[in-house]
């Protein structure tokens, strides 16, 4: 039985409606999948950017922390150097004051004579030369001459050696120094400096750990004394 035009049109409409419905469902499915993929990609991008931002600020925070440590270390080093300079300045001032007080020793002739006796004899013992030359300040010549005359017999007995000791009257020590003597061997190539300043410097060097300890306290980081 042949279909009428109305039936054909009805079937065509039904098929078109089915195709349209299927197309709409497919389009909705594609849209949903596309939206899902978009949201996933958007979330991935957001997470990636969030991680990048976090890494950036973590790196910046570490850099700032490192800069703080370096700056703090520099400040502590500068402060430590200032303290050391202040301590050195104080010790230098004390030594300068001690050198100025040496003039009081020289003014006491009796005391100074005893000191010169010891300095001359000590210098002779240090050189142990057959011929030695003593140099002094011009104003100390009489005292040094007396010291040499006392030292020679003592030296001979102690060393069992003969010795010729002369006082240099051509070149004297500067008048500006506090006092004391310099003693040379015969050809003046070897010298023992026993001026008051040189003896004070030597004592200061030997006693420096004790001086620092008395002024500033013991150094906890120091295991050995100089």
Swiss-Prot record:
Modified residues (Phosphotyrosine): 56
Main location: membrane
Coiled-coil annotated residue ranges, if any: none
Keywords, alphabetical: Acetylation, Cell membrane, Cytoplasmic vesicle, Hydrogen ion transport, Ion transport, Membrane, Phosphoprotein, Synapse, Transport
Residue numbers carrying N-acetylalanine: 2
Location(s), subcellular: Apical cell membrane; Cytoplasmic vesicle, Secretory vesicle, Synaptic vesicle membrane; Cytoplasmic vesicle, Clathrin-coated vesicle membrane
One Gene Ontology biological process: proton transmembrane transport
GO molecular function: proton-transporting ATPase activity, rotational mechanism
Pfam families: vATP-synt_E
Expression tissues: Expressed in brain (at protein level).
Topology within the bilayer: Peripheral membrane protein
Family per record: Belongs to the V-ATPase E subunit family.
Database matches in PANTHER family: ATPASE H+-TRANSPORTING V1 SUBUNIT E1A-RELATED (PTHR45715)
HAMAP family xref list: ATP_synth_E_arch
Assembly with partners or alone: V-ATPase is a heteromultimeric enzyme made up of two complexes: the ATP-hydrolytic V1 complex and the proton translocation V0 complex. The V1 complex consists of three catalytic AB heterodimers that form a heterohexamer, three peripheral stalks each consisting of EG heterodimers, one central rotor including subunits D and F, and the regulatory subunits C and H. The proton translocation complex V0 consists of the proton transport subunit a, a ring of proteolipid subunits c9c'', rotary subunit d, subunits e and f, and the accessory subunits ATP6AP1/Ac45 and ATP6AP2/PRR.
Role: Subunit of the V1 complex of vacuolar(H+)-ATPase (V-ATPase), a multisubunit enzyme composed of a peripheral complex (V1) that hydrolyzes ATP and a membrane integral complex (V0) that translocates protons. V-ATPase is responsible for acidifying and maintaining the pH of intracellular compartments and in some cell types, is targeted to the plasma membrane, where it is responsible for acidifying the extracellular environment.
Protein name: V-type proton ATPase subunit E 1
Species the sequence originates in: Bos taurus
């Amino acid at each position: 039985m042949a279909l009428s035009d109305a039936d054909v049109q009805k079937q065509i409409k039904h098929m078109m409606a089915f195709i349209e419905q299927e197309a709409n469902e497919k389009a909705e499915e594609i849209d949903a999948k596309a939206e899902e993929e978009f949201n996933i990609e958007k979330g991935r991008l957001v997470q990636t950017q969030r991680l990048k931002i976090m890494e950036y600020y973590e790196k910046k925070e570490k850099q700032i922390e490192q800069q703080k440590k370096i700056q703090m270390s520099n400040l502590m080093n500068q402060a430590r150097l200032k303290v050391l300079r202040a301590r050195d300045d104080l010790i230098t001032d004390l030594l300068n004051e001690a050198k100025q007080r040496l003039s009081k020793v020289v003014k006491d002739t009796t005391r100074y004579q005893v000191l010169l006796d010891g300095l001359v004899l000590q210098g002779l013992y240090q050189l142990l030369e057959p011929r030695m030359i003593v140099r002094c300040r011009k104003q100390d010549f009489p005292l040094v001459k007396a010291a040499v005359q006392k030292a020679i017999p003592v030296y001979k007995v102690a060393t069992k050696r003969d010795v010729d000791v002369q006082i240099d009257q051509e070149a004297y020590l500067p008048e500006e120094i506090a006092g004391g003597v310099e003693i040379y061997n015969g050809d003046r190539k070897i010298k023992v400096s026993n001026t008051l300043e040189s003896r004070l410097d030597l004592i200061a060097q030997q006693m420096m750990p004790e001086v620092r300890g008395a002024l500033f306290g013991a150094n906890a980081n120091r295991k050995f004394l100089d």
